[in-house]
Amino acid sequence: MSKPIQMERGVKYRDADKMALIPVKNVVTERQELLRKPEWLKIKLPTDSSRIQGIKAAMRKNGLHSVCEEASCPNLSECFNHGTATFMILGAICTRRCPFCDVAHGRPVTPDANEPEKLAQTIQDMGLRYVVITSVDRDDLRDGGAQHFADCISAIRAKNPTIKIETLVPDFRGRMDRALDILTATPPDVFNHNLENVPRVYRQVRPGANYDWSLKLLERFKEAHPDIPTKSGLMVGLGETNAEIVEVMHDLRRHGVTMLTLGQYLQPSRHHLPVQRYVSPAEFDEMKAEAMAMGFTHAACGPFVRSSYHADLQAKGMEVK
């Protein structure tokens, strides 16, 4: 077992170093080690990677980050090749250490005051019409980073007046009132916050987070902006059951959420939580049917679905899986 480390500000800690401080340890069993990816999870890489390299170059030029890269998303090649990306603001170091996530943990540096302007210019240069903005958790900031989100939204709209903006926000733990005061004054076009999984496994999957708190965040934003869609996503394969997923879907509807994403959890490294099961495309189709019957206006359900995967198509109600 790794020993706890003394964190230095601005240093990214990953894998064993990141997991050393998690209270619920990941003990991999022989059965879990033998669990193999099914054929439907094999990814075909594009033959032409020039668009991918172009987006990466634009990010590096302006000192920006994408969650696609930082979280090792399996859809990176597809999304970058189609000219889309999910921008991650407030740095690339998270104050949380969720054992399903590949984003680095540590003591983050002070937010870049020029990031909103650089982000807006990059989006204009890329000619994007729909953009997703997310962030690491910033428990070190008094507002959890809410003002930085608002500054980014304002800067993007100033340079790109017709663009649609979706924000995928953290839970603003202990700062909900302050954060919502800011975000309701400068709202996005879609407000997204992921529950990630079912409440029974929260202590293991989302240490430091609270299921009811996350539901309340979604509900309160919706109450302030009834006409703005709220959205949430879950991963399957972390020990939950399909029945528990359906119950979470009911909870989301009871809290006013109308957009849903369901995707397969994939283990980033052997130090992360192991995959407990692989859910078939047919099961995802069944969950989508249940979601639509509950009253969700949009439900993207499939093995490769992530909360920002083809988010522009999701917002239009087009089929995504």
Swiss-Prot record:
Query: What Gene3D superfamilies does its record include?
Result: Aldolase class I
- Please write the reaction equations for the catalytic activity of this protein: [[Fe-S] cluster scaffold protein carrying a second [4Fe-4S](2+) cluster] + N(6)-octanoyl-L-lysyl-[protein] + 2 oxidized [2Fe-2S]-[ferredoxin] + 2 S-adenosyl-L-methionine + 4 H(+) = [[Fe-S] cluster scaffold protein] + N(6)-[(R)-dihydrolipoyl]-L-lysyl-[protein] + 4 Fe(3+) + 2 hydrogen sulfide + 2 5'-deoxyadenosine + 2 L-methionine + 2 reduced [2Fe-2S]-[ferredoxin]
Query: What keywords sit in the KW lines?
Result: 4Fe-4S, Cytoplasm, Iron, Iron-sulfur, Metal-binding, S-adenosyl-L-methionine, Transferase
Organism superkingdom? Bacteria
Instruction: State its cofactor.
Output: [4Fe-4S] cluster
UniProt binding sites for [4Fe-4S] cluster 1: 68, 73, 79, 308
| Primary location recorded for the protein, binned into one broad class | cytoplasm
How are cofactors bound according to the entry's free-text note? Answer: Binds 2 [4Fe-4S] clusters per subunit. One cluster is coordinated with 3 cysteines and an exchangeable S-adenosyl-L-methionine.
The pathway entry for this protein reads as: Protein modification; protein lipoylation via endogenous pathway; protein N(6)-(lipoyl)lysine from octanoyl-[acyl-carrier-protein]: step 2/2
| Residues covered by the Radical SAM core domain | 80-297
Instruction: Cite a single Pfam family from the UniProt record.
Output: Radical_SAM
- Where is this chain's protein located in or outside the cell? Cytoplasm
| Binding annotation for [4Fe-4S] cluster 2 | 94, 98, 101
Q: What Gene Ontology molecular-function terms does this entry list?
A: 4 iron, 4 sulfur cluster binding; lipoate synthase activity; metal ion binding
Task: State which Enzyme Commission number(s) the record gives.
Answer: 2.8.1.8
**GO CC annotations, alphabetized:** cytoplasm
- Homology family: Belongs to the radical SAM superfamily. Lipoyl synthase family.
Cross-referenced PANTHER family, in alphabetical order? LIPOYL SYNTHASE, LIPOYL SYNTHASE, MITOCHONDRIAL
The name of this protein is Lipoyl synthase
